[in-house]
Amino acid sequence: MKKISKRLESIKAAHTIKKVASTTREEDYLEVIAELVELKGYATTLDISRFMNVSPPSVTKMLQKLDEKKYLEYEKYHGINLTNMGKQVADTIRRKHSILLEFFEILNVGQGIANQDTEGLEHHLNPKTIRQLRKYITFLKSNPKIIKQFHEFSRK
């Protein structure tokens, strides 16, 4: 697997640093699976373990749990398919992830901090907060002088 998305790299980096709660962890698995499927057409236990920084048996255990909750269909050695419900959760998290990462990039906090904070916050923000943050980013980008002024101000 030569091409790796920025989102997968940021997930991997965040999971190198800290452990997260169960529901947050489930969302991260769904996010990684969706990203892998989009990138290469499928997701394997080994791929997931690499990006989540966990052992393949841990991935198998989580896949079984997500299968029981109807987020995906999993049969050992036969593949992983997200259900519509799993796709919805993954898509929601992926949208939040993109918006937060873009915001932290505007704040100019550095990629490492942006990745870590995005992974920490994406699971906990209200949808309205995300919508407003998207509007704010759009506003800032339509007024690049404000971003430039902020960057100059924050260097002081």
Residue spans of the language-model regions?
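N-terminal leader segment of winged-helix/HTH proteins
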Residues: 1-23, 155-156
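C-terminal regulatory/oligomerization modules of transcriptional regulators
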Residues: 2, 122-156
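A ubiquitous short alpha-helical element
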Residues: 15-18, 84-89, 102-103
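N-terminal helix-turn-helix DNA-binding core of bacterial DNA-binding proteins
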Residues: 16-54
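Residue-level recognition of specific faces of alpha-helices
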Residues: 32, 62-65, 71, 85, ...
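Canonical helix-turn-helix DNA-binding module
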Residues: 45-80
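Basic, amphipathic "hinge/linker" alpha-helix immediately C-terminal to the N-terminal HTH DNA-binding motif
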Residues: 78-96
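Arg/Lys-rich, alpha-helical DNA-contact motif
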Residues: 94-132, 136
